[in-house]
Amino acid sequence: MNDRKQSRYFVRAGEVPAYHPARHTGTVNRRLIGDHVGARHVEVVLGVIEKGQGALPHSHPGIEQVCYMLEGRARAEVGGEACDLGPGDCCFFPADMPHVFTVLSEEPARVLVIYSPPYAENADKRRDVL
């Protein structure tokens, strides 16, 4: 990819604006793939989460979510089950199902997150669990 030319199909994570997702603590996300590249049915996000931080209880009505661990360790909780995850592990959060994700490692966790259909950090597509 030519560094001086913008492309609709190729994305460099360092060039994507960061944001702090709702119902998460100590988390910085970068939306790598979404409608800005023409994706209509999938969204891919790179998340970096600090130790002891992560996703508070919430669900995504009508949206499935997959988390793939790149670095660090975290505990995922969904459907009454919990599992500690490390690099190369992944978890699935079904649509409408409350879930929690908490980093256990000293170093930040880097997580590739996939949503289908796209979530686009839309509050109308999230259900907080209090």
PLM regions: where:
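A short, N-terminal "cap"/entry segment at the start of jelly-roll beta-barrel domains
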Residues: M1-H41, D124-L130
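Conserved short histidine dyad/triad with adjacent acidic residue
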Residues: N29-R31, V45-H60
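Short, charged/polar surface micro-motifs in flexible loops or helix N-caps
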Residues: V37-R40, I49-Q53, R73, A82, ...
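A short hydrophobic beta-strand segment most commonly corresponding to one strand
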Residues: L46, F92, E107-N122
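Short, conserved beta-strand element in jelly-roll/cupin
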Residues: V48-E50, S59-A76, I114
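Tight coil/turn sites that cap or link beta-strands
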Residues: K51-G52, G88, D96, E106
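Short beta-strand His + acidic residue motifs that chelate non-heme Fe in jelly-roll/DSBH
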Residues: L56-H58, A76-E77, F93, H99-E106
